[in-house]
Amino acid sequence: MGASFLTGVLGVLIDLKPAALLINDKINDSRLLDNKRILEILNKLGLDLVREKLNKFSNEEIEYLYLAKTARECLELQKWHREFFNSVSESGEVLDKKVWAEANYQIGKILGYPETATLEYIRMQIEGIEKDNNYRSRMERNYYYMHSARYENEEFEAYDLRLNLAVNEYLPVTAEIMQANIKKRWLD
């Protein structure tokens, strides 16, 4: 089971994020949720799951998983994810900047990302700002989402650090794997 799946589930369980947007990944010719045990575990944890297959941007159909403590949150995330998909062309070009920006803002909010990071991501995309070395180095050193240039440390403390501490406590094997990547920040 992938670290992104586990950290997404954990983020919801510790109330860091209202919902998680995951992918039913293919592993060894089967999909993650083909293992019914995982669905049973999610149910025992009190989590709801909505599944939807989409195939925009490629010929491959991707099954998205909207996971939260309530079906209402799952459906809200699904709604905004669809809005995002509808605001871009098959090639990924933004068709409606206002709809695209609002969809990304709402998705970031539902995923629990710091607002400063979400707003900078939207601004960079809308204004077509080049991804410079500072941008690339922030991507290289942080997990989970694109941190803003100005508030990177505050965002790390508000989201990443809380999730990483929970991963250390509840998912020690995953923590070990994630900490092996010495380029990524962990508890500092």
Where do the protein language model's features map onto the residues?
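A conserved ligand/cofactor-binding region detector
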Residues: 1-95, 103-106, 113-188
